[in-house]
């Protein structure tokens, strides 16, 4: 049983719905007509996407230079009576890595501002054992305090925070970032390693009350494979390479005969959960392990998960609903194809990137700079979440990583 808990907070949304806080109104693009057309100019498009992230990062900062960008804005998440501002650490990690990909001085400054916030919430967690939580309130950070909005500690989230901190250490040489990454990794190893129930790997994390999530997720183990491999390179400690191999072997065990990769296990930690089949398990298995065997998963994706919604074409989030495009997935599918470099892959990747640029310009609730999460409101993930056509930092960051050809699961070689 695998959940997409790093991307959204369905429990928060359900509570808000029950309280009558969500309205059906949508907010139109505030300044789209004033933004230059970047659909035919990839460099301009990238520059505008970074401008979107810059504005989000600078919106919520404290007096010590720590900043935390809200994850979603506009449309479903912004109505006349309610504004959803939580910041998901998965999105924050992607933004950090996207900034290091371009690497301008202001990019590194903003990446450090987010990274310092991640260290701040880690150091000030109520339990204080190296964990971070799913999401935090940026208004709290602005006031110099930690306000947890998503209290779960999910393994995939931890690995993404770790990869962001590892990337910051690689970019800046500041030891505090590597120390924070190692703390995260030790939490993962201590609390989620499963070497009893084959296939061995890492379980889903913990709920707020300390209840362990005993299923194992392909996506989470892919995250760990990438993160622990980075730690092995940065620390020189081969134990992290050994642990990365455990996670990678779990992912291998989830690959079906037709090439696709299943989502993980049921509660027994061994029985394969075959529904739904998510896009992440296909693309991230390739990016996170670097294993050519998952090229078959990319081919399966192209055959089974591509959606067309009006002028937009690209992957959906899973096989549950292939009527809408998930632009975050367009980003990591484009990056996977670009890095694989097989016959026709470059053209396919560019087509996906062109679709994102079109959404950047024309999508409902867009601003001409950032990228919305989906082509239409209400995309069903199959895991109990709905996704909406609202501006999203994580989607925008994946676009920038794909445009740069920068794999967040691996450290840069330059």
Language-model segments: residues:
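Non-membrane alpha-helical segments in proteins
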Residues: 84, 91-101, 113-117, 160-164
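N-terminal export and membrane-targeting signals
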Residues: 2-16
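C-terminal region of N-terminal signal peptides and the immediate post-cleavage residues
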Residues: 21-40
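Tandem alpha-helical RNA-recognition repeat domains
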Residues: 100, 166, 170, 229-233
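Alpha-helical support elements that line or immediately flank enzyme active sites
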Residues: 96-105, 111, 282-283, 337, ...
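Aromatic-anchored glycine-rich loop motif in surface-exposed flexible loops
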Residues: 149, 170-171
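Extended ligand-binding clefts on enzyme/binding-domain cores
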Residues: 37-77, 86-90, 120-146, 152-156, ...
